[in-house]
């Protein structure tokens, strides 16, 4: 969870911080579990507000009331986390990922996250959450900068766009094929760097 790192790095984060080399490339994908797995009461309120009380055009034009909350989560907090991971040694590059789209609903699909996806209206109106994720990428992930290294934003929703069930397990986890598509995107982003 990203919020578990607000004040202190976890042990495996400290391992990265203490062992990363200047020739390494760091790929960071955090924040999804703060929304889907164990959200805070505030996160739940903001997600439900976005899903049920916000017009699509307000998300699209970035005037949605809840958007600054997620801009802070996926922008300011992720940047702080990456800065602390790279505080001892700056890697060659950092790839910062925005979450992928969950698999869109079809009859008969099962998932541990079905209740959460339904509460977010993803089963009936996936375009709304997808637009919110796109906007969070634009206003947060794409703006992350870490002094002393190159930062490359990565929209994981491009290779995992919620349309192909072969890319997912339980609607919210990448399958082997989904993982292959994400890896191909990383290679594409880093072409010319490595």
Question: Where in the sequence are the language-model features?
Answer:
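Conserved SGNH/GDSL esterase-like catalytic core that processes O-acyl groups on lipids
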Residues: 1-73
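Short, well-ordered beta-to-alpha junction loops that form the rim of enzyme active sites
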Residues: 97-101, 155-158
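A structural motif corresponding to the C-terminal end of an alpha-helix
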Residues: 73-95, 132-155
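Histidine-centered active-site loop/cap adjacent to the catalytic His
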Residues: 166-194
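Short, amphipathic alpha-helical "lid/cap" segments that border enzyme active or binding sites
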Residues: 13, 71, 75, 79, ...
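Acidic carboxylate-rich catalytic motifs and surrounding loops in phosphoryl-/glycosyl-chemistry enzymes
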Residues: 1, 149-167
